[in-house]
C-alpha cells in the first residue's frame, strides 16, 4: 500500500464539495427530510483493501500531514455547526408583544390617542385615558418580563451538544502518533482510542483489543457494546465495526479510520435535526389567540355600533371617536394576562413539587390536552437496573424478587444446587461494589462492572450474604474474560470445600455452556446430561427468553487434587485444564423490571382516553414482555404473531385488523409509507415500536400528529432529542437524561418515573378547567364596566362608573379571587374523561361569553345601576330627570343646576355626588362578584357538593371586600382616585342581585345535571 498519498478518486461519503454546493441550493425542508431518513453507510461492509482504495489511507502509517491539511481545507473542521440562534431581545419582544399582550398594547395606544384628541379639543381634559394607557403599558411590561424570566432558562440545545464533543484525539500520521485538537481530525485519518476516551468522529474499526463502547446516548442501549473489525449487521447502527462520534470507549483499545466528521456524523445529523425542527404553536397559545379574536370581535362590534349610534344621536365626530375608543378599551380585561400567567406559574410550582419540572409555562396546559404518549422503555417504564428475575435449577424455574423494596416472592435457598449456582454467580463475576457504601441498601449501591454482572452481584449479596467474603474464601487463580468468539467467561479458584483443591467456574450464553457439559447437578448430585434433561433445559431457556429476559448459563468442575495439586501452573493461552465435560448447574435470567407505579399509571392513562405507545431501541421480545408487564398491551389483547401461534397458521394469513395490539420492528418501519404508518396508528389501540432509530422516533411522532393527536414524548438519550423537540410536549428524564434531551424538552421528570407524567396530565387538565373558571369570573365584570359607558352615551346621564374605578376592579379587587380559582380542586374525576378536542373544546367559547356577558354580567350591571340611581335619588335627582342632563352636568360654568326638588348644585358638588356614584357602582360590582366567584367554583356540580374548602378563595372574598372598603374610606383616595366614602346602607343595594346570581346559577346547574346533553347544557355549559 502506498504511503498515505490519498487516492485522487476519493470522495468522502457525505462531505464532498458536490454535497456542499447542492446543499446550498436545496431548501431547508428538503435538508430536514434528508436528515429524517435512516443513516446510509456502507463502510462497515468494506474489507481493508476496499477501505484503503476509498480513503487512500495507509492502514499502518495513516495520512501524510500534507494530505490531512488538504482535506481539512476542503471539508472544514470536525465540529458541529451552531444553528442560527434567536437573539435574546427578539425573545423578549415576543413575550412583550405576542399573544394576549397585543390586545393590551392596542388598548394602551387607543387610550393615548383618546387623551391626545381630548388635549387638542378640550380646555381642561380629564386625565383618565392617560392613566389608563400608562397602567395598561405597565401591566404588559411587568407580565412580559415575568414570562421572559420564566422561559429564559430554556432552549440552548446546541450548547449541550457542544459538551459532547471531545477536545483531543490521538491520530497516526506518517506512522507517528500525535495528540491533536479533535477539530483538526479529517476524513481518512487513522485514529486510536482507549478506555475512557470519547470517540472523536465516526470510525470504521480496523483493529481492536477487548474494546467496548457505551452507545447509550445514541441508541438507548445501556449495556456496553463490543467493537471489533468484523462486519456483524446490515444496520450500520448495530454493526460491531463502527464506533460513533461522541460515544464513550469504556474499556480496551481500538484503531479506526475516520469515515465522517462534524455535521455528517450520525450524532451530527441528530444535532442538526433537533435544532432545525420547526415547533408548532402550543394548544394554550392557540386558545389565547382564539380568545383574543372573540374579545376583539365583541369590542369592535360594540364600539362601531355605538360610534354609529352616537353620530345618529347628534354627537360630534370627535366625541364619537372618543366613545369608540372608550368602548373598545372597556372591553379589554386588563387583569386577565397577569391572571393567566400567575395561574400557569402556580401550577408549574405545584407540578415541580410532584417531580415535574416545567421549563415552558404553556407546556403546563399542553400536558393536560395530551391524547397520545410515546414513551421510552428503559428508565421511564422500567427501573433502569438489570435485576435477576428467574433461576432454573433442579429442573424447576424459580422466581426471584424484582421489587424495589424486596417485598416480593421468596424461593428455597437451602437447596444444594442453589448453593452451587450462587457460588458460580459470585465467583465468575468481575463486578464489585464501590467503596464506602456499607450503609446504603444493597439494591441502591453503585457497582463497578457491567449491568448483567451487577445484577448477579446484588442478587447473591441479597440472598447469600457478603460476596466479597465468599471471594476471599475462594481466591481467583486465573481467568479467561468473556469475548464475542467463545461467548463464555471462565475462572479458576482455590476451593474452600474439602472435596478438591481447585474449582473451575464458567458462565456464558446458555447453549454454549450446555455444549461444554456432560453432567447436570440435580439436588446436589451430578447426573448424566441425557436427552430428557437437554429438552428440559431447552424448554426453560425458551420460556425465559420469551419473557424478554437475558439468560445466562452456569457450570462448574471440581478439579481433582491428583491432577491439579497445589501450585499447579494453569495456562489460559493454551488451556492445560478441562473446558469440556463440565457439570451444568443452572440458568439465571435478568430483566430491567417495570417500575412499581407504572402499571397503575398506564391504567389511568387508558381510562383518561390517552393512548400509550412504547418506542424503544430494545429487542421486540423484551419490549413486548415489558409492554405486557406494565399494561401497554393489556391482558387478552393479541398481536398478529399471537393469533398466528394460537391458530397455528402463518403470520401472513392473519388479517392485521383482527389484532388490537401490534409490535412493529424498526426494520419494518423503515419500509412503511406514511399511509401504512397512519393505518397502524389508527387501527391498533396498543402499539409497541421496537429496535427504532432516532429518525424513526421522529417519524412516529409526526404520524401521531397527522392523526390530530396532541403528542407527549418521553426520552433520555441524545437520540430522543429530535422527537422531544417535535412533540407537542417533550418530557426528558432528570436523572438518566442527557443534557441534550433536557434542553430539547419542555418538561423534565425529576424522578424519571412515568407515573409522574400522569400526575402532570391531571394537573394540566385541572388548570384548563380552572382557567376557564378564572376567565368566566374575570369577563363577567366586563359587562357592569361597559354598560355604564353605553347608558352614558345613549341616555345622556352623568357617567355612572369612571375609568380609574374600572382599573381598581380589574387590577385590584378581581385579581386575587381570579387567581384563587387556580387552587380549586377538580369537580369530578377528570382522569375518567376523554382528552379535550382542541378543535371543539375551546378555553373560551360562545357559551362562556353568553353566560358571562349575556346572563350573569347583565344581572351584575342591574345591581350597579340600582345603587347608582339610589344615591342620585337620595341626593335629589330622580331617574326620570337624569335623562339628557349630561351636558349641563359636565359644564364647568353651570353653577346652579337644579335637581328634582329645585335645589341648586354647583359643579364641584355635582362631581362629588358623581364620584360617590362611581364608588358605589364599584362596591356593587365587588358584592355581585362575590356570588360570581362562588358560582365559578364549579361548572356542573352544586356548590353544596363542591364545598368551600379552597382557603385561597375564601381569602380572596375577604381581600376584595377589604380593598373596596380601604379605597372608599381611606383619606386621600378622594383626591388620588376620586373615590368617596359611602353610607353603610349603600353597601346593601347590590345584595339582592348577588343572591339572584347565586340562585339562578344553582338552578341552571341543577337542570344541567338532571338533563345531561339537554338544551340547557348545549346553550350554557362552558
Swiss-Prot record:
What membrane topology does this protein have?
Multi-pass membrane protein
Pull the Lumenal topological domain ranges from the record. Answer: 109-131, 309-320, 792-801, 866-917, 970-984
UniProt: Mg(2+) binding residues: 716, 720
Stretches for region Disordered: 1-34, 215-235
Biological processes annotated in GO: intracellular potassium ion homeostasis; intracellular sodium ion homeostasis; potassium ion import across plasma membrane; proton transmembrane transport; sodium ion export across plasma membrane
Q: Write down the EC number.
A: 7.2.2.13
Query: Can you state which reaction this protein catalyses?
Result: K(+)(out) + Na(+)(in) + ATP + H2O = K(+)(in) + Na(+)(out) + ADP + phosphate + H(+)
**What Gene3D superfamilies would the database entry show?**
Calcium-transporting ATPase, cytoplasmic domain N, Calcium-transporting ATPase, cytoplasmic transduction domain A, Calcium-transporting ATPase, transmembrane domain, HAD superfamily/HAD-like
Q: Which segments are removed on maturation as propeptide?
A: 1-5
Transmembrane annotation, as ranges: 88-108, 132-152, 289-308, 321-338, 772-791, 802-822, 843-865, 918-937, 951-969, 985-1005
Q: Does the keyword Signal apply?
A: no
Please provide, in alphabetical order, the Gene Ontology terms of the cellular component aspect for this entry: plasma membrane
Q: Which domain of life is it from?
A: Eukaryota
The UniProt entry, under Pfam families, shows: Cation_ATPase, Cation_ATPase_C, Cation_ATPase_N, E1-E2_ATPase, Hydrolase
Q: Example GO molecular function term?
A: P-type sodium:potassium-exchanging transporter activity
Q: What does this protein do?
A: This is the catalytic component of the active enzyme, which catalyzes the hydrolysis of ATP coupled with the exchange of sodium and potassium ions across the plasma membrane. This action creates the electrochemical gradient of sodium and potassium ions, providing the energy for active transport of various nutrients.
Give the protein family: Belongs to the cation transport ATPase (P-type) (TC 3.A.3) family. Type IIC subfamily.
**Full protein name:** Sodium/potassium-transporting ATPase subunit alpha
Q: Which organism is it from?
A: Tetronarce californica
Amino acid at each position: 500500500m502506498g504511503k498515505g498519498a490519498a487516492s485522487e478518486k476519493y470522495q468522502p461519503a457525505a462531505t464532498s464539495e458536490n454535497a456542499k454546493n447542492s446543499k446550498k441550493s436545496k431548501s431547508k425542508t428538503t435538508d430536514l427530510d434528508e436528515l429524517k431518513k435512516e443513516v446510509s453507510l456502507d463502510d462497515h461492509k468494506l474489507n481493508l483493501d476496499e477501505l484503503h482504495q476509498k480513503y487512500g489511507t495507509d492502514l499502518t502509517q495513516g495520512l501524510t500531514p500534507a494530505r490531512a491539511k488538504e482535506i481539512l481545507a476542503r471539508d472544514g473542521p470536525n465540529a458541529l455547526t451552531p444553528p442560527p440562534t434567536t437573539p435574546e431581545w427578539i425573545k423578549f419582544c415576543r413575550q412583550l408583544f405576542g399573544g394576549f399582550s397585543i390586545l393590551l398594547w392596542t388598548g394602551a395606544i387607543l387610550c393615548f390617542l383618546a387623551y391626545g384628541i381630548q388635549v387638542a379639543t378640550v380646555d381642561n381634559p380629564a386625565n383618565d385615558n392617560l392613566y389608563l394607557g400608562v397602567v395598561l403599558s405597565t401591566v404588559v411590561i411587568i407580565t412580559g418580563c415575568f414570562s421572559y424570566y420564566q422561559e429564559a432558562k430554556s432552549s440552548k440545545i446546541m450548547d449541550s451538544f457542544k459538551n459532547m464533543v471531545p477536545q483531543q484525539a490521538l491520530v497516526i500520521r506518517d506512522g507517528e502518533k500525535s495528540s491533536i485538537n479533535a477539530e483538526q481530525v479529517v476524513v481518512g485519518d487513522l485514529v486510536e482510542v482507549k478506555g475512557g476516551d470519547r470517540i472523536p468522529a465516526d470510525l470504521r474499526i480496523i483493529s481492536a483489543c477487548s474494546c467496548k463502547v457505551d452507545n447509550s446516548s445514541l441508541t438507548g442501549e445501556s449495556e456496553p457494546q463490543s467493537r471489533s473489525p468484523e462486519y456483524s449487521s446490515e444496520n450500520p447502527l448495530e454493526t460491531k465495526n463502527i464506533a460513533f462520534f461522541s460515544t464513550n470507549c469504556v474499556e480496551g483499545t481500538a484503531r479506526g479510520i475516520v469515515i465522517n466528521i462534524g455535521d455528517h456524523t450520525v450524532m451530527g445529523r441528530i444535532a442538526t435535526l433537533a435544532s432545525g425542527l420547526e415547533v408548532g404553536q402550543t394548544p394554550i397559545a392557540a386558545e389565547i389567540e382564539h380568545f383574543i379574536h372573540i374579545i376583539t370581535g365583541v369590542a369592535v362590534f360594540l364600539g362601531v355600533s355605538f360610534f354609529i349610534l352616537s353620530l345618529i344621536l347628534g354627537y360630534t365626530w370627535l366625541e364619537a371617536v372618543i366613545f369608540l375608543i372608550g368602548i373598545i378599551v372597556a372591553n379589554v380585561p386588563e387583569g386577565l394576562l397577569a391572571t393567566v400567567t400567575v395561574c400557569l406559574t402556580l401550577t408549574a410550582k405545584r407540578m415541580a413539587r410532584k417531580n415535574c419540572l416545567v421549563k415552558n409555562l404553556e407546556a403546563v396546559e399542553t400536558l393536560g390536552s395530551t391524547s397520545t404518549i410515546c414513551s421510552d422503555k428503559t428508565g421511564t417504564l422500567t427501573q433502569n437496573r438489570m435485576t435477576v428475575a428467574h433461576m432454573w435449577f433442579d429442573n424447576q424455574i424459580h422466581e426471584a424478587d424484582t421489587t424495589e423494596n424486596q417485598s416480593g416472592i421468596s424461593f428455597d435457598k437451602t437447596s444444594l444446587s442453589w448453593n452451587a449456582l450462587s457460588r458460580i454467580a459470585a465467583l465468575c463475576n468481575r463486578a464489585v461494589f464501590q467503596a464506602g457504601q456499607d450503609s446504603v441498601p444493597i439494591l441502591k449501591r453503585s457497582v463497578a462492572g457491567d449491568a448483567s454482572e451487577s445484577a448477579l452481584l446484588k442478587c447473591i449479596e441479597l440472598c447469600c450474604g457478603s460476596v466479597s467474603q465468599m471471594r476471599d474464601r475462594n481466591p481467583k487463580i486465573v481467568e479467561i474474560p468473556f469475548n464475542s468468539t467463545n461467548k463464555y467467561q471462565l475462572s479458576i479458584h482455590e476451593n474452600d470445600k474439602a472435596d478438591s483443591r481447585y474449582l473451575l467456574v464458567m458462565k456464558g450464553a446458555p447453549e454454549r455452556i450446555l455444549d461444554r457439559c456432560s453432567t447436570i447437578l440435580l439436588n446436589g448430585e451430578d447426573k448424566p446430561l441425557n436427552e430428557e434433561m437437554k429438552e428440559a433445559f431447552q424448554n426453560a431457556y425458551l420460556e425465559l427468553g420469551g419473557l424478554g429476559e437475558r439468560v445466562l448459563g452456569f457450570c462448574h468442575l471440581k478439579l481433582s487434587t491428583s491432577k491439579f495439586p497445589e501450585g499447579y501452573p494453569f495456562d489460559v493461552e493454551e488451556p492445560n485444564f478441562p473446558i469440556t465435560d463440565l457439570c451444568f448447574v443452572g440458568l439465571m435470567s435478568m430483566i430491567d423490571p417495570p417500575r412499581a407505579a407504572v402499571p397503575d399509571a398506564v391504567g389511568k392513562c387508558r381510562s383518561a382516553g390517552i393512548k400509550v405507545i412504547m418506542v424503544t431501541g430494545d429487542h421486540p421480545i423484551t419490549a413486548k414482555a415489558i409492554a405486557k408487564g406494565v399494561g401497554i398491551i393489556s391482558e387478552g389483547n393479541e398481536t398478529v404473531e399471537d393469533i398466528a401461534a394460537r391458530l397455528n397458521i402463518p403470520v401472513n394469513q392473519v388479517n392485521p385488523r383482527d389484532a388490537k395490539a401490534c409490535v412493529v420492528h424498526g426494520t419494518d418501519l423503515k419500509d412503511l409509507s406514511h399511509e401504512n404508518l397512519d393505518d397502524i396508528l389508527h387501527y391498533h389501540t396498543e402499539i409497541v415500536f421496537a429496535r427504532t432509530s432516532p429518525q424513526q422516533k421522529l417519524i412516529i411522532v409526526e404520524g401521531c400528529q397527522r392523526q390530530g393527536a396532541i403528542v407527549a414524548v418521553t426520552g433520555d438519550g441524545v437520540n430522543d432529542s429530535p422527537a422531544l423537540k417535535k412533540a407537542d410536549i417533550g418530557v426528558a428524564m432528570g436523572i438518566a437524561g442527557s443534557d441534550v434531551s433536557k434542553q430539547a424538552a419542555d418538561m423534565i421528570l425529576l424522578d424519571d418515573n412515568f407515573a409522574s407524567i400522569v400526575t402532570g396530565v391531571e394537573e394540566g387538565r385541572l388548570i384548563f378547567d380552572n382557567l376557564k373558571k378564572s376567565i368566566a369570573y374575570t369577563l363577567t365584570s366586563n359587562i357592569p364596566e361597559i354598560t355604564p359607558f353605553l347608558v352614558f352615551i345613549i341616555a345622556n346621564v352623568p357617567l355612572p362608573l369612571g375609568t380609574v374605578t374600572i382599573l381598581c376592579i380589574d387590577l385590584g379587587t378581581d385579581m386575587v379571587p381570579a387567581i384563587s380559582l387556580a387552587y380549586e380542586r377538580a369537580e369530578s374525576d377528570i382522569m375518567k374523561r376523554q382528552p379535550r378536542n382542541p378543535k371543539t373544546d375551546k378555553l373560551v367559547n360562545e357559551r362562556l361569553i353568553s353566560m358571562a356577558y349575556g346572563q350573569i354580567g347583565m344581572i351584575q350591571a342591574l345591581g350597579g345601576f340600582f345603587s347608582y340611581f339610589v344615591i342620585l335619588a337620595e341626593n335629589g335627582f330622580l331617574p326620570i330627570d337624569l335623562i339628557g342632563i349630561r351636558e349641563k352636568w359636565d359644564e364647568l360654568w353651570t353653577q346652579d343646576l337644579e335637581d328634582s326638588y329645585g335645589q341648586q348644585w354647583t359643579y364641584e358638588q355635582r362631581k362629588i355626588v358623581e364620584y360617590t356614584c362611581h364608588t358605589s357602582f364599584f362596591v356593587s360590582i365587588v358584592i355581585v362578584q362575590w356570588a360570581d366567584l362562588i358560582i365559578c367554583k364549579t361548572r356542573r356540580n352544586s356548590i353544596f357538593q363542591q364545598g368551600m374548602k379552597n382557603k385561597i378563595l375564601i381569602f380572596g372574598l375577604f381581600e376584595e371586600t377589604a380593598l373596596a372598603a380601604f379605597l372608599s374610606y381611606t383619606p386621600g383616595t378622594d383626591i388620588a382616585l376620586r373615590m368617596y366614602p359611602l353610607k353603610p346602607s349603600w353597601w346593601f343595594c347590590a345584595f339582592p342581585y348577588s343572591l339572584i346570581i347565586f340562585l339562578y346559577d344553582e338552578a341552571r346547574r341543577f337542570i344541567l345535571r338532571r338533563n345531561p346533553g339537554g338544551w340547557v347544557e348545549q346553550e350554557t355549559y362552558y
